[in-house]
Amino acid sequence: MTAIRKKSLALTDLFMALCASRCVTFGLQNVTPTDPRYRGSHVSLAAANDGYAMMQALIARGVIGDFRRGDAAGEPDLLRFGFTPLYTRFVDVWDAVQQLVEMLQNAEWKRPEFNREQVVT
């Protein structure tokens, strides 16, 4: 295993562990395989609803991820985060989770500006 892949796994492991300990009470659930053989450098968190607004609130805080809308069959919204091991630092992971927790604690996603859907090109 290369050093880059090892760092990728360490970054995603850290993010998943921090989210498990700090975000689960807010209804977010990791849906990324914990077995490193079955995951890349992304982590997806399921949100029962309001995923779009949550991601917009995170982007406003400087945490850039992307959003995948759930479907009518009950699939949840997904907040997806990528970890590029060439330049993402472990402190960046800690900071991102702290921003996520603060956004959730303050219910910032409920603000009107985060609930206006944008056109994506």
Predicted segment positions?
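Alpha-helical structural signal in soluble globular domains
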Residues: 14, 18-22, 57, 99, ...
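PLP-dependent enzyme catalytic core of the Aspartate aminotransferase-like
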Residues: 60-65, 69-121
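Short, conserved charged micro-motifs
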Residues: 50-56, 91-93
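Short beta-strand-to-loop capping motifs
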Residues: 45-49, 83-85
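Conserved small-domain helix->loop->beta segment predominantly found in fold-type I
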Residues: 1-47, 66-75
